[in-house]
């Protein structure tokens, strides 16, 4: 067992620097939104490990965090090769879930922010109460907000874009299901208007209803809503996975 010890000296928010690699940028030379979400996953783990809560700690107790909702706002241009300072902090919680907020800084300016709402589950996938050790190590208020939701209107009269595909092996993470950042890429791939996908500023909102697994056949339906786009992602057998929006 890894001891957490006295963490009263831990800085808030936690900070880490990331350099945007060549393969993390799009054809416009700017960081992908999914890259920012991957950075946020990584810094959350680094933060947790620094306070004594590594993967072994969670495995020993049979619990794990899963993302239930995410919001990614790109406010400025982040080019390939740039080094951004990313922050993370737990800004609110309830019995079984917590929200992290991250901000991305480039040359001292905020160029993006990300909210991730995490639920704690046990080995059966059932919601689990947050252990008191975590409450003590990550002091934060009882949330006066709800887990993120994405309400979608019915498909507009304009033609919807629909395509099907299968989950590829490289899209899986150590938990054995599709990494939550991959859904951001899939949302962008559903939108035929490149100017929407590359618009700055823009904001992504995703609600995760279920997780896709190895080899699953998926069906994505996307449609325009003014200058923004909505998407429903479901299994080929009909179960809903994701409700998402890209807003500009």
PLM region spans:
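HotDog/MaoC-like acyl-thioester-processing domains
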Residues: 3-4, 9-16, 73-157, 208, ...
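Hot-dog-fold acyl-thioester-processing enzymes
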Residues: 2-67, 113-115, 121-203
């Amino acid at each position: 067992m890894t001891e957490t010890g006295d963490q009263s000296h831990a800085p808030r928010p936690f900070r880490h620097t990331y350099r945007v690699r060549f393969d993390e940028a799009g054809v416009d030379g700017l960081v992908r939104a999914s890259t920012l979400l991957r950075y946020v996953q990584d810094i959350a783990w680094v933060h947790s490990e620094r306070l004594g809560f590594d993967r072994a700690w969670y495995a020993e107790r049979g619990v794990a965090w899963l993302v239930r909702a995410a919001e990614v706002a790109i406010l400025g241009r982040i080019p390939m090769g740039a080094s951004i300072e990313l922050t993370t902090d737990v800004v609110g919680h309830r019995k079984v879930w917590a929200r992290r907020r991250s901000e991305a800084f480039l040359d001292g300016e905020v160029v993006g922010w990300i909210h991730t709402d995490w639920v704690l589950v046990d080995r059966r996938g059932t919601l689990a109460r947050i252990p008191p050790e975590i409450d003590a190590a990550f002091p934060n208020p009882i949330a006066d907000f709800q887990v993120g939701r994405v309400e979608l209107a019915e498909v507009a009269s304009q033609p919807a874009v629909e395509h099907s595909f299968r989950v590829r092996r490289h899209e899986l993470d150590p938990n054995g299901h599709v990494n939550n950042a991959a859904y951001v890429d899939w949302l962008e791939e559903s939108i035929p208007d490149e100017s929407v996908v590359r618009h700055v500023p823009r904001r992504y909102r995703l609600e995760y209803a279920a997780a896709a697994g190895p080899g699953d056949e998926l069906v994505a339906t996307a449609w325009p809503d003014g200058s923004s786009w909505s998407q429903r992602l479901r299994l080929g057998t009909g179960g809903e996975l994701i409700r998402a929006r890209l807003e500009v």
